[in-house]
Amino acid sequence: MSVPIVILAIIAIVVGVVGGYYLRKSVHERKLDAAKYTAAGVLAEAKKQAETATKEALLEAKEDSHKYRAEVETELKERRAEVQKQEDRLIQREETLDRKDNSLEKRENSLNRRDKKLSAEEQNLVKKQQQADSLIEKRQAAVEAVAALSQDDARELIISEAKTALASERAKMIKESEETARKTAQANAKDLIVSAIQRSAADMVTETTITVVTLPNDDMKGRIIGREGRNIRTLETLTGIDLIIDDTPEAVVLSGFDPLRREVAKIALEKLIQDGRIHPARIEEMVAKAKKELDEHVRELGEQATFDLGIHSMHPELVKLVGRLNFRISHGQNALAHSIEVAKITGVLAAELGEDVTLAKRAGLLHDIGRAAEHEDDNSYITTGMELTKKYRESSVVVNAIAAQAEETAAQSVIAELVSTADIISATRPGARSDSLESYIHRLDKLETIANEFDGVDHSFAIQAGREVRVIVRPDRISDTDAVVLARDIKQQIEGDLDYPGHVKVSVIREVRSVEYAK
């Protein structure tokens, strides 16, 4: 091989190596530039995402801040309302203490007047005794002067005559005192009763059997009725109350003899109107909420009544029953208002006679507690009240005050007599009671009681002013055939046990629901 060829080969190798180096360097630089560009894009994207995340975090923090502020403001409002309520209670308690202070002051003044009167009478008696002694001395001197009597004989004669004169005067004074005491006692008794009535004055409103619910517009009537009347039937079935929808503008009338049911229907209907969604499922939900809300309202009524009367440490169940009295009527009187009035009158009478005022008020408030219970048996409200007060460990004085309302049970304490007296005072004042309404409600209650006595009946409602009884039965115990027989049996029982005008329609309702959930 020649030298030039070797040199050319070496040169070619060197050129190839140098060219490959620079070619590789160029490719590496291009890759490096591409990597830098990609890194810059990633960095920019990361910055962008970081800015977005920062903004979202700031927005979320602001929302949390607003939400927390709203919760704090709501809690502050609730606390302010609670503080205001406590302040109102303290004000009421101060007013009660002021009234008691005035009563004690009047009683003290009365005792002072009696003391002054007794002191004057005592001075009068001492004066008359001195006059009698002076008369005896004068007679003794006269007898000794004109008669030949010894001193002992004269003394006996004078004493005998003085005794006769004093006995006559004493009898006259006793008769005058008895007559004065009789007149004073009668006047004091009248003043005491009038004072008790005035100091315990309570507004009495005769309950009716209807409640009016105001509508925002007349278009709401059609929504309440629903397609083919489904909504109104559902509401009537769940509450046992008649809904009367007529030409009265923007109003629906709820008719039923039970004020508790009417109140449930009213609350549920008002919630449905406010919500705007009226259909059977929503109606069931609102009726359940209304019942729960009414239970809370009943408890608050009982607590307010016991607080106003200064009665403490009463069993919570008894407090709820006291609240339920607001939805019971007796001879046209609101039972809670009547019981509060009786409690106040009993307290006033007990204070005048020196009895335990708090115990007297307690007995007066609970004297009709049996009317608040759901009567599932044939016991009278007096027997039921005795059982309830014994169950919740009330004083024997309270139990006897309830029992003494029955003629066959004697009052065993002064407080029991005072409760009976206060009950009569509250019941017999003009305009306090209405017997016709009481008898009407008793007939409706009897209709439901007859229906509920049959096996398989879940509950029943007397509606249409007693012209219809709707009986809801348990579908697992009453078949369609049994429902026909049950309606006939209830009809015959009503015909045998009740006197009523016109006809009574018996409607037996059997409803079967099958529910499955698709997952």
Swiss-Prot record:
Keyword RNA-binding carried by entry: yes
Query: Where, per UniProt, does this protein localize?
Result: Cell membrane
- Residue ranges of the HD domain? 335-428
Question: What Pfam families does this protein map onto?
Answer: HD (PF01966), KH_1 (PF00013), RNase_Y_N (PF12072)
Q: Which family does it belong to?
A: Belongs to the RNase Y family.
Q: Where exactly are the transmembrane stretches of this chain?
A: 3-23
Q: What functional role does this protein have?
A: Endoribonuclease that initiates mRNA decay.
Please report the record's description of how this protein sits within the membrane: Single-pass membrane protein
* Domain called KH: residue spans: 209-272
Which InterPro entries does the entry mention?
HD/PDEase_dom, HD_domain, HDIG_dom, KH_dom, KH_dom-like_a/b, KH_dom_type_1, KH_dom_type_1_sf, Ribonuclease_Y
What is the name of this protein?
Ribonuclease Y 1
Q: Where is the composition biased (Basic and acidic residues)?
A: 92-120
Region annotated Disordered sits at 92-124
Q: What is its EC number?
A: 3.1.-.-
Q: Assign the protein's first listed, main location to one coarse class.
A: membrane
Question: What UniProt keywords are attached to this protein's entry?
Answer: Cell membrane, Endonuclease, Hydrolase, Membrane, Nuclease, RNA-binding, Transmembrane, Transmembrane helix
What's a Gene Ontology MF term here? RNA binding
Specify the enzyme's EC class, one word: hydrolase
A GO cellular component term found in this entry reads:
plasma membrane
GO aspect biological process, one term:
mRNA catabolic process
